[in-house]
Regions:
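Generic structural signal of hydrophobic/aromatic residues within well-ordered alpha-helices
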Residues: 9, 58, 62, 107-110
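Short amphipathic alpha-helical segments
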Residues: 1-5, 99-106
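Negatively charged, low-complexity tracts enriched in Asp/Glu with abundant Ser/Thr
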Residues: 1-45, 116
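Acidic, proline/glycine-rich low-complexity IDRs
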Residues: 101-119
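Intrinsically disordered, low-complexity regulatory segments enriched in Ser/Thr/Pro
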Residues: 38-102
Length: 119
């Protein structure tokens, strides 16, 4: 059932170090928000949707997010006008990039765990 799938996704995400919230009031589109703090303490999150109670749509959405994830661009978003980290990001650009590269790996690990469980 859909509730069992939501529970499994939640359990797997938590095992991988992610916090998760699920917005399932609309049964045709259930939104999952995955959140974690990076090694350098940045609050990182992303969303993916499950359409029509089909777990494959959630995994496909997460896969698209992972494939489109650009650590350099994500790091750029955290660089202030002075060329250093802002809003809680590390001071040095190289550390911001490293943090986002590690975040990309964490997204991949979560995606892989869900694929093993559901595909």
């Amino acid at each position: 059932t859909t509730q069992e799938q939501i529970r499994k996704v939640t359990d797997i995400a938590q095992e991988k170090g992610w916090s998760i919230s699920v917005e399932d009031e609309n049964k045709t589109s259930i939104q999952f928000e995955f959140q974690r703090y990076t090694k350098y303490g940045q609050d990182f999150n992303f969303n993916a949707d499950m359409q029509d109670e089909d777990i494959d749509t959630l995994i496909a959405g997460m896969k698209r997010y992972y494939e489109d994830f650009d650590p350099d661009y994500e790091a750029y978003l955290w660089i202030g006008d002075d060329g250093h980290g802002r809003n809680g990001a590390p001071y040095h650009i190289k550390d911001i990039v490293s943090d986002m590269e590690e975040t990309e790996e964490k997204i991949y690990e979560l995606l892989q765990a869900l694929e093993v469980e559901f595909i």
